[in-house]
């Protein structure tokens, strides 16, 4: 398809060659005219596909990735691009190809990404993943790096931000060869570090990490979460700037899950600032979106509807962070300091130093002692 496009436009080949990193257009022509020829650095091909076929990227790359020789570098790079995009079905197929290859490095990549996928699907525990990666006797710099980085996602899922931070210190970018994989790993780690900073209420750092992720990546998923995080850091500070960041993220919300998350962020922002709210999710049974709906009803003065939702949630298995929000919303209805103190307790248990501001601000408005509030928020 790239060859066909170049035949339509004589100047296109030169532009694409430059985009893909070729010093001379002849090298690019050799690639497009030789079906079995693979680019040494997958990043060049990705830029071309995004430039020419932005709406067909997943379909075209899925077909191409599965045709790659699993013994070669390009196939190993393809598993990273597929995984970072969360093209899970494709990723699993590439992993099988790598594991069944004759190349020991490809086999190693297949094993490590297989562990990463099993962790994501909760098919193995963190301890099992650490033990199994140790058995792999990893030799490549890329997989030594990724076998640690993948643990940070698992720690994020269970709210272990301290372990995320200590693991991030094990990551050595200087050991990685220059090219697509290094840049992709940089964008991954930047977003993980942004999550750590947001949790620690280090908002400027969180924005810096997020902007760095955007600079290092053209992956929709990474850019989406980067703008989402930037917006989250601005929730209490500036309604317009937070909304602007979320709207920028809209461009990268390419699947229903991301769109739902974005709508949830806009809903929460509108609730906090008591603005007109067109993002309330009236259909989801997810705890987060039920809580947001209750928050909206509270703002509307529809206490009966809000109470009904919170009563329903009282019998649900909410995690500690969700309980922090739950008791905050209960406090908005009851105006009972006890609910706000419970909210603080659960936000502290979940190590959330950012959203703990919600009950603290309410208690301050109710005349609670500032020194006491500062003490209990530590």
Swiss-Prot record:
The keyword Transcription regulation applies. It comes from the Viruses. One of its GO terms (biological process) is latency-replication decision. Keywords: Activator, Latency-replication decision, Transcription, Transcription regulation. It comes from Bacillus phage phi3T (Bacteriophage phi-3T). Transmembrane segments: none annotated. Homodimer. Interacts with the viral arbitrium peptide, this interaction changes the oligomeric state of AimR from an active dimer to an inactive monomer leading to lysogeny. Disruption phenotype: Knockdown results in decreased AimX transcription and increased lysogeny. SUPFAM superfamilies: TPR-like. InterPro entries: AimR-like, TPR-like_helical_dom_sf. This is AimR transcriptional regulator. Gene3D superfamilies: Tetratricopeptide repeat domain.
């Amino acid at each position: 398809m790239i060859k066909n496009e170049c035949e339509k436009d004589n100047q296109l080949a030169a532009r694409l060659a430059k985009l893909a990193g070729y010093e001379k257009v002849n090298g690019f022509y050799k690639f497009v005219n030789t079906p079995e020829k693979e680019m040494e650095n997958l990043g060049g091909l990705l830029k071309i596909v995004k430039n020419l076929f932005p709406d067909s990227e997943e379909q075209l790359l899925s077909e191409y990735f599965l045709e790659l020789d699993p013994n070669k570098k390009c196939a190993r790079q393809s598993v990273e691009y597929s995984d970072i995009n969360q093209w899970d079905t494709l990723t699993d197929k590439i992993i099988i190809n790598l594991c069944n290859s004759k190349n020991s490095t490809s086999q190693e990549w297949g094993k490590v990404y297989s562990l990463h996928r099993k962790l994501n699907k909760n098919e193995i525990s963190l301890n099992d993943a650490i033990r199994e990666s140790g058995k792999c006797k990893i030799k490549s710099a890329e997989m030594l790096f990724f076998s640690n980085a993948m643990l940070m996602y698992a720690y994020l899922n269970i709210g272990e931000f301290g372990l995320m931070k200590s693991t991030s210190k094990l990551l050595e970018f200087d050991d990685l060869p220059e090219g697509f994989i290094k840049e992709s790993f940089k964008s991954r780690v930047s977003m993980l570090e942004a999550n750590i900073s947001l949790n620690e209420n280090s908002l400027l750092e969180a924005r810096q990490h997020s902007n760095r992720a955007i600079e290092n990546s053209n992956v929709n998923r990474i850019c989406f979460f980067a703008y989402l995080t930037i917006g989250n850091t601005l929730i209490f500070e500036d309604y317009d700037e937070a909304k602007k960041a979320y709207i920028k993220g809209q461009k990268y919300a390419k699947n229903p899950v991301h769109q739902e998350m974005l709508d949830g962020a806009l809903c929460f922002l509108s609730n906090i600032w008591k603005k007109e709210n067109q993002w309330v999710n009236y259909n989801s049974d997810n705890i987060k979106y039920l809580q947001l709906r209750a928050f909206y009803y509270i703002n509307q003065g529809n206490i009966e509807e809000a109470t009904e939702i919170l009563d329903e949630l009282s019998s649900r298995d909410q995690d500690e962070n969700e309980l922090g929000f739950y008791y905050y919303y209960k406090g908005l209805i009851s105006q009972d300091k006890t609910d706000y103190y419970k909210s603080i307790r659960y936000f502290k248990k979940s190590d959330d130093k950012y959203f703990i501001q919600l009950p603290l601000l309410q208690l301050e408005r109710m005349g609670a002692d500032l020194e006491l509030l500062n003490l209990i928020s530590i």
